[in-house]
Structures are given as structure tokens and as C-alpha cells.
Design a protein with these regions (language model features):
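Non-catalytic, polymerase-adjacent accessory regions of viral genome-replication enzymes
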Residues: 1-57
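Active-site-proximal segment of RNA-dependent polymerases
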Residues: 1-8, 12-18, 103-159
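Conserved, non-catalytic sequence blocks in retroelement Pol enzymes and Pol-derived host proteins
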Residues: 48, 120-122, 199-203
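Conserved polymerase palm-domain catalytic core
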Residues: 55, 62, 135, 139-211
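Reverse-transcriptase-like RNA-dependent polymerase core
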Residues: 59-82, 95, 102, 136-137, ...
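Conserved pre-motif C helix in the palm subdomain of viral-like polymerases
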Residues: 84-113, 193-211
Length: 211
């Protein structure tokens, strides 16, 4: 907690462009708070927080100098109930993910349709349920007639996303070359032998920008 309090000294930094906003101490601090939400007792969060200013300063310097690269992923098997191979990024890298999203979200969010609910502020499960109930009643004449609802899932979506199409969609809105460099670093993974795993882990960060 002491590290968090000390970080308040950096919160008044003013930045001019998108990339500077991403690697600012202010943004990285709030990204850290977002990344640790619900995980404050995890050992890796406590370890990061123990030297918080040093960790965030290091990230800021690496990002500013464009020397940042992702750390190796932790891979494990999840059964819920189907078996899936999950590749999980380190907490340090998750802070960077949240730092990017905090700056990019306001740019893209206004272009999404009203009923797009995934990973949007103020539009969680409850909002989706209320909208579903509204449409259900509308299409069934207040439950007086039959209707159909399609539930679908795209198999291996994250692994199969075309990077060229995704980057083109992002570039329509993001003109900062350094931001695009960072996004390409994340999507590329930085380590060829882990490319498939990195795709699984990092594409979800940008998936909604395809909407």
C-alpha cells in the first residue's frame, strides 16, 4: 500500500500524444490498479506491488525507448468442462495491456453499436440480460408468440483472427506510429517459438476493435 501512496506523486503528469499517454506513470498506475482488481492476494501482485514505483518506472522507460518486450507465458490446462490449453501473460504484461486499453477504448467505443456488451464500461451481464429481455418481449409480442434465438460461437476465434485485417481496423483510428509498433509487438509475441500461445493470450486485448 505504501507503494500505491507514493505513486500519487506522478498522477499530474500531462502528455501530448497517444503513445506518451500510454507510457505515462499516471496511466500505468491506473492500469496496475485495474490489473490487480480481484487479485490483491495473489503472490505475483504482491511481488509487483512491493517495488511498485520501480516496476512502473521500468515499464515506462522501456515503453518510451521502444525496448519493451513480452515475458514468457505460463501455459496450463483448463477443464470447464471442455479441455482447453490456456496461455497466461505475466502480471507485468497485463499492466501494459490495461495501459493500452485505457487510452484506446474512448477512441473506439463511440463507434460500437449500442447493444455490444463485451468488455465495455457500464455494459456488463446485467445490461445484456435486460436488453435480451426487451428484445425477447418485443419479438414475441410480450411472450404471446413463438420466436427463435441463435446462440453461436466461433471456433478457435482468437487463434484464427487475421492480423492484417485487425491491424487495418485499428490503423483507421490510430495514427500514432509508436502505438502501432507496440500493438504489433504484442500481437507478434516477440518470441517465434511461442507465437501460437501469444496469439491466444494477446488477441483478446484488441478483439473488440474488429466490431
Amino acid at each position: 500500500m505504501r507503494g500505491i501512496a507514493q505513486c500519487q506523486d506522478y498522477l499530474n503528469m500531462k502528455q501530448d500524444n497517444l503513445y506518451q499517454q500510454i507510457h505515462s506513470m499516471k496511466n500505468l498506475f491506473f492500469a496496475f490498479k485495474k490489473a490487480r482488481k480481484g487479485k490483491t492476494k495473489k503472490y505475483y501482485v504482491k511481488r509487483f506491488e512491493k517495488c511498485l514505483i520501480k516496476q512502473l518506472l521500468t515499464l515506462s522507460i522501456e515503453l518510451k525507448s521502444q525496448k519493451y518486450s513480452q515475458e514468457p507465458l505460463r501455459t496450463f490446462i483448463l477443464r470447464d468442462p471442455k479441455t482447453r490449453k490456456i496461455s497466461k501473460s505475466t502480471f507485468r504484461d497485463r499492466v501494459v495491456h490495461h495501459a493500452i486499453v485505457r487510452i484506446m477504448d474512448p477512441i473506439f467505443d463511440k463507434n460500437f453499436i449500442y447493444d455490444s456488451c463485451a468488455n465495455r464500461k457500464g455494459k456488463g451481464n446485467l445490461f445484456a440480460l435486460k436488453r435480451f429481455d426487451l428484445f425477447k418481449r418485443k419479438i414475441t409480442n410480450n411472450l404471446n408468440s413463438k420466436a427463435f434465438c441463435l446462440k453461436a460461437d466461433i471456433k478457435h476465434y482468437f487463434q484464427e483472427v487475421n492480423h492484417k485485417i485487425l491491424l487495418t481496423a485499428i490503423e483507421r483510428k490510430i495514427k500514432d506510429e509508436k502505438v502501432m509498433w507496440l500493438i504489433k509487438q504484442i500481437l507478434g509475441g516477440g518470441r517465434t517459438r511461442q507465437r501460437y500461445a501469444f496469439r491466444q493470450s494477446y488477441i483478446p486485448v484488441f478483439r473488440k476493435y474488429l466490431s
